């Protein structure tokens, strides 16, 4: 599989997990920068995707070339994965969606 790109929606195998993390084969949005993808050539940073609307303001609706049904990026669950967990391509979010996702991640990191 080619290198992931920022905003790409990929299929990942997330087992084993702990607590409230999603398990199994799931879609995730790549949030790594191009520089991180280039430097950390065996890793990728992602946020998982859900089709359940919980009404949480930090869950970002995916816009772009993605799924036939509404889906949301779960920005509170940023995870760095081995690229060996990537098992396929699912689509691409638009630039505005990726910016919204990254803004939420930055908000979680700011003091």
What are these regions (language model features)?
Residues 1-111:
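Conserved functional hotspots at enzyme active or ligand-binding sites that engage polyanionic ligands
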């Amino acid at each position: 599989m080619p290198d992931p790109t920022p905003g790409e929606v990929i299929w990942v195998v997330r087992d084993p997990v702990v607590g409230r993390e999603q398990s199994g084969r799931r879609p995730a949005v790549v949030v790594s920068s191009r520089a991180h993808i280039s430097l950390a050539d065996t890793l990728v940073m992602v946020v998982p995707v859900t089709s359940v609307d919980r009404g949480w303001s930090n869950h970002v609706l995916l816009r772009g070339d993605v799924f036939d049904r509404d889906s949301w990026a779960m920005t509170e669950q940023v995870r760095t994965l081995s690229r060996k967990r990537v098992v396929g391509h699912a689509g691409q979010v638009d630039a505005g969606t990726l910016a919204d996702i990254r803004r939420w991640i930055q908000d979680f990191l700011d003091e």
